[in-house]
């Protein structure tokens, strides 16, 4: 069985500020003392430089811990007349290692199709970033028993355009749309069922990828349900939304992941 390092990625969405970043690092410096889990902070792009500077300033205090920086979005284009967009190279230059791709809010609010998501996945990897690919079903799709069908479609188009081995340098996040920002989380059993399906789906084309890819759960993860979720054999941590804005809660989630 592969030893997959747990990950906790905090997606601030359009929230937070430089003071929140400082508060997080103050707590990290005294509490994160080992590398048994990887922590990723994904602030709004305007605060990437603040987080990068905090990573540099706290390098000694965080010695032994794995704290990285990620972005919430990336353009599928390398450069050009795309007002408001940020390229993969720009994110790489800013110190990012990860970037969230295909979050349900981007798909729903900004019309990001699966084809665009696949292009952004490729753009991220082209510039040395590791994509955190989000997949998940809506409430009606779950009620219609189409969960696996929807997720297979979202995975397959990325595989078709980028190849299975692209997942050797990628993270997958299962985020059921009916649980994102609603306070209603999937049960540990529901999460495990879908994570096992994702792993099996990838294993069918590459046993190595299927065994080694990290799959996070995202959808109203809190300190009260994280231990049971992270204990599932195919759940490798969490993509955290609201709880990532509370330094105490986020630190608790990191600690839980470290002992998972």
Curated annotation (Swiss-Prot):
Pathway per the UniProt entry: Carbohydrate biosynthesis; gluconeogenesis; Carbohydrate degradation; glycolysis; D-glyceraldehyde 3-phosphate from glycerone phosphate: step 1/1
Active-site residues per Swiss-Prot or TrEMBL entry: 103, 175
Major location (coarse): cytoplasm
Top-level taxon of the source organism: Bacteria
Keyword annotations from UniProtKB, A to Z: Cytoplasm, Gluconeogenesis, Glycolysis, Isomerase
Subcellular location: Cytoplasm
Chain positions recorded as substrate binding sites: 11-13, 181, 220, 241-242
Keyword flag tRNA-binding: no
Family according to the record: Belongs to the triosephosphate isomerase family.
Record-linked NCBIfam families: tim
Its EC number(s): 5.3.1.1
Protein name: Triosephosphate isomerase
